[in-house]
């Protein structure tokens, strides 16, 4: 999920386990023993969680670059108590608004990069609350969100960006990351410099290093074991490259990829291994916690694969090396939430074509299907997608929600993203949502 800008382009309780986790989370080391997070070969995850009878009416709440929260101005408040109060009140106001709209689930970004929005023993504090990496904001944002959302009868899924370490590679960012060397815990950037690569003009972890997979899994385990989250979600950031900033993993491929026919197959196996490890780990700790992924809307185009959709878009399988269809078929996910960010009239990637394609994928499985829709496009002028401008985008939004309600395999909708509920150009659509979903 390209959360930094979200201008998506078409080229688009088992006691033994808990004891082990307690030892892991009390340790200062950032790399857990492999046995703690790696399932036995050939094992399958336990049965998925039971589906709620209530349809998903979700919202993504992004914290990266303070897109939705915390308020940008709050970071300039010098008094920590006053700053925390302002941030907490902003969260309360947002949740009150979401409750009025009928939103029942918040996908809260707790790991936007290589930092955390909870007091982690593995990651340093995020700079998003204070302006400085590693600085304690004086409260626990994840716990505060959980308390306030659950008080309102809303669920919270902890949203992780698994591989991203930073949102840019500027000298100032490097200085900030290096400054954590004297902290506990320090950034993975300084603890494991050999894991770090540059890709898409960001510092990222190399997905092909087995220790990286285990390290990411340990972070998820920390949250699931310590907090009453209702779910865990990974966004669509797997292998994320740009034409001018490709990920150089040639050495990693030479070391670990000998058994694969191609580098692309090896990369897809790496993301597959991470998803499998995280899925098994979550179910071993708390079987009731849901695990899902929100990938790009196109798995593969039919022109490249007869099993693909009748589309011409950037495919997760080929671009991000994420075989999301396979993850569904193997039962690794409780839900999948493809980002179908195009209108019915976009011939290269029609909303209805993709939604029905995904419905067919999940039909023989136990994986639930939620559709991520592009609320950020509502009311925005577009020559390519003019439907978002017609009558404030309400007719297009209504068609998408109607389809989601009509197809039995679709269990709900997630809107991208929260701050767009407050934009002047979306207010007709917000009023429509309240009349449709609100109490």
UniProtKB/Swiss-Prot annotation:
Q: Where in the cell is it found?
A: Cell outer membrane
Lipidation sites of kind N-palmitoyl cysteine? 28
Q: Where is the signal peptide?
A: 1-27
Q: Please give the start and end residues of each transmembrane region.
A: none
Q: Which SUPFAM superfamilies match?
A: (Trans)glycosidases
Membrane topology type: Lipid-anchor
Per the annotation, which location comes first and is thus the protein's main one? membrane
Q: What is its EC number?
A: 3.2.1.-
Assigned keywords, A-Z: Cell outer membrane, Cell wall biogenesis/degradation, Glycosidase, Hydrolase, Lipoprotein, Membrane, Palmitate, Signal
Query: According to the UniProt record, what class of enzyme is this?
Result: hydrolase
Q: Where is the lipid attached (S-diacylglycerol cysteine)?
A: 28
Region entry Disordered: which residue ranges? 34-54
- Spell out the GO cellular component terms annotated for this protein, sorted alphabetically and separated by semicolons: cell outer membrane
Q: What InterPro entries is this protein classified in?
A: Divisome_Glycosyl_Hydrolase, GHL10, Glycoside_hydrolase_SF
Extract the Gene3D superfamilies matched here: Glycosidases (3.20.20.80)
- UniProt miscellaneous comment: Overexpression suppresses the chaining phenotype of the tol-pal mutant.
Q: Which PANTHER family match?
A: GLYCOSYL HYDROLASE DIGH (PTHR43405:SF1)
Role this protein plays = Divisome-localized glycosyl hydrolase that cleaves peptide-free (denuded) peptidoglycans. Has either glucosaminidase or muramidase activity.
Q: Which family does it belong to?
A: Belongs to the glycosyl hydrolase-like 10 (GHL10) family.
Q: What is this protein called?
A: Glycosyl hydrolase DigH
Q: Which organism is it from?
A: Escherichia coli (strain K12)
